[in-house]
Amino acid sequence: MALGPAAMGYDRAITIFSPDGSLYQVDYAFEAVKRGWTTLGVKTKSGVVLLAEKRKATQLLDVDGIEKIFMLDDHVGCTFAGLASDGRILIDYARSQALQHRLIYDEPISIEYLTKVISDVKQAYTQHGGVRPFGVALIVGGIDKGKQPKLLMTEPSGQFMPYYAVAIGQGGYTATEYLEKNYKEDLDIQSTILLALRALMATLKPGEKLNYSSVEIGYADVDSGTFKKLTTEERSDLLQKI
């Protein structure tokens, strides 16, 4: 975004709107999300799937040691695109809020409320001086009371929305196009995982391939109501089916 001298004041100040209604620092935080590894979530009647790509920035990087899918509580997990350090802080906060809710109310926290808690923190960092917005978007998914699958995404601005399927990061646009054409609500959980994998594969450049080290997968199915992560062997077996 090229800015002239008149716009530079709005560019530098997080709490001042530009004449066209923009908060430039929040807009830049969205750019950090777009630069992140491709990440997506899919919700069907059978459950919720979260999937995250992992890329080697250098041949010496051990991607097996990088975590991109996180359990927040027994029934809910999340993933993110953007600044990993920002994501880690928000995930730790979400985990503490979920645990606190269990201790006080003796029941799991609702997924929408947990997402709101995360989003409230993000929103607060868009209107105070001396801080910057969180340069990360989180996709939160799991199974609520009554075996209700839930999938939501929080933006750097603090806004959050429910989705049937959502994709963010470098390949977010291409993955979203694939999901719009191929999404079906009545898929079983394995078919939902395969749909998410194919959406990620649609973002790859010619000659690139997915393997068990370059993707991380988590899911929650309505039958068990719990969030799980696929093992290396399970990821490898699924990739052979594509």
UniProtKB/Swiss-Prot annotation:
Identify the taxonomic lineage of the organism of origin: Archaea, Thermoproteota, Thermoprotei, Sulfolobales, Sulfolobaceae
In alphabetical order, the GO MF annotations are: threonine-type endopeptidase activity
Where would one find the signal peptide in this protein?
A: none
Task: Tell me the protein's name.
Answer: Proteasome subunit alpha
| Quaternary structure annotation from Swiss-Prot or TrEMBL | The 20S proteasome core is composed of 14 alpha and 14 beta subunits that assemble into four stacked heptameric rings, resulting in a barrel-shaped structure. The two inner rings, each composed of seven catalytic beta subunits, are sandwiched by two outer rings, each composed of seven alpha subunits. The catalytic chamber with the active sites is on the inside of the barrel. Has a gated structure, the ends of the cylinder being occluded by the N-termini of the alpha-subunits. Is capped at one or both ends by the proteasome regulatory ATPase, PAN.
Q: Where in the cell is it found?
A: Cytoplasm
State the gene name recorded for this protein. Answer: psmA
Matching PROSITE patterns: PROTEASOME_ALPHA_1, PROTEASOME_ALPHA_2
Keyword check for DNA-binding = no
User: An example Gene Ontology cellular component term from the record?
Assistant: cytoplasm
Give the matching Gene3D superfamilies. Answer: Glutamine Phosphoribosylpyrophosphate, subunit 1, domain 1
Annotated keywords = Cytoplasm, Proteasome
Q: Which family does it belong to?
A: Belongs to the peptidase T1A family.
The answer to whether the entry has keyword Transmembrane helix is no
Activity regulation per the record?
The formation of the proteasomal ATPase PAN-20S proteasome complex, via the docking of the C-termini of PAN into the intersubunit pockets in the alpha-rings, triggers opening of the gate for substrate entry. Interconversion between the open-gate and close-gate conformations leads to a dynamic regulation of the 20S proteasome proteolysis activity.
**General function of this protein:** Component of the proteasome core, a large protease complex with broad specificity involved in protein degradation.
**Which superkingdom does the taxonomy of this entry point to?**
Archaea
Query: What is the native source organism of this protein?
Result: Sulfolobus acidocaldarius (strain ATCC 33909 / DSM 639 / JCM 8929 / NBRC 15157 / NCIMB 11770)
Q: Which cysteines are joined by disulfide bonds?
A: none
